[in-house]
Regions:
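Patatin-like phospholipase
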Residues: 1-37, 45-285
């Protein structure tokens, strides 16, 4: 049986999924395929490296630093989040908390990181084999929130956040041969996602990136469709949705350590359902 896990991201709400992954590492639970979208890309790569607690540190310590995100970055780099600081300065071999690149590559599990081509609006699925030591550009590209960040270039091609191209890539997991898939959401699964500021941000990138802007305008509908599809698969016993019943007040860019810690522990507790699911028990729909 081939198992997969999909982390849809969600900015700093991703600490919920970080709790799920730490539970899995504590219980020696591993997946044959890991797919990360946006902040989910950081979660899956640290999980493949076996670095328990690494994501927790990034969310609860580094994300609070002005170097990580803030108005100063917006003025200096035209991006609110400094992706080079997150996935370079902190994560490179000489950084404060280096990614164990060798462990990632030695892990037999497959990995896909989703980014969105800013020129075409299409999803690109970067594979683990495209990762190289101290060059974690796929994670930067996957996390480049439109308007909040400039698109990130990989091989001279600009990319935006993966959630524009494929917000809930559960179908991709099945297309890759998975039999059972854990879908990590960082919003309550029983609440449809609202439009938020998507239209506002889409208007800001429309002139230069019209296809990406169109994908941004339809992202909410496609996210809700992806969750509905995941629920259908859950009723069939092929998917387990792990999601918080409450986000503890944490939003995409919330800088509240106490709230993030609560959400992390909620994720850790909710992950207990994964053991039974992978053992063949059907998830409650």
């Amino acid at each position: 049986m081939k198992t997969g896990i999909v982390d849809v991201g969600g900015g700093l709400r991703g600490i919920y999924a970080a709790g799920v992954f730490d539970y899995c590492l504590d219980r020696d639970i591993h997946f044959d395929l890991s797919i990360g979208v946006s902040a989910g890309s950081a979660n899956v790569v640290s999980d493949l490296a076996g670095q328990r607690g690494r994501n927790y540190t990034f969310y609860t310590e580094y994300a609070l630093r002005k170097e990580y995100m803030g108005a100063r970055n917006l003025l200096a780099r035209r991006s609110y989040i400094d992706l080079d600081y997150v996935y370079g300065t902190l994560s490179n071999s000489g950084g404060e908390y280096p990614l164990d690149y060798q462990a990632v590559m030695e892990n037999p599990g497959e990995m896909l990181v989703v980014a969105t081509n800013a020129l075409t609006g299409s999803a690109r699925y970067f594979s683990k084999e495209e990762l190289s030591q101290d060059r974690y550009d796929m994670c930067k590209a996957s996390s480049a929130i439109p308007f909040v960040c400039q698109p990130y270039e990989v091989d001279w091609m600009p990319y935006f956040d993966g959630a524009l191209g494929d917000p809930v890539p559960v179908e991709k997991a099945f297309a890759c041969g998975c039999d059972r898939v854990v879908v990590l959401l960082t919003r309550p699964a029983d609440r449809e996602r609202g439009p938020g500021k998507d239209a506002f941000f889409a208007d800001r990138i429309q002139r230069k990136y019209p296809f990406a802007a169109q994908k941004l305008r339809t992202r909410v509908a496609r996210y809700n469709e992806g969750v509905a599809l995941s629920k259908k698969y859950q009723a069939e016993g092929r998917v387990l949705i792990v999601s918080p019943d409450d986000t503890c007040g944490v939003d995409t860019l919330t800088k509240d350590r106490a709230a993030m810690m609560r959400l992390y522990h909620k994720g850790y507790r909710d992950a207990e359902a994964i053991t039974a699911f992978l053992a063949g028990e059907r998830a409650a729909s």
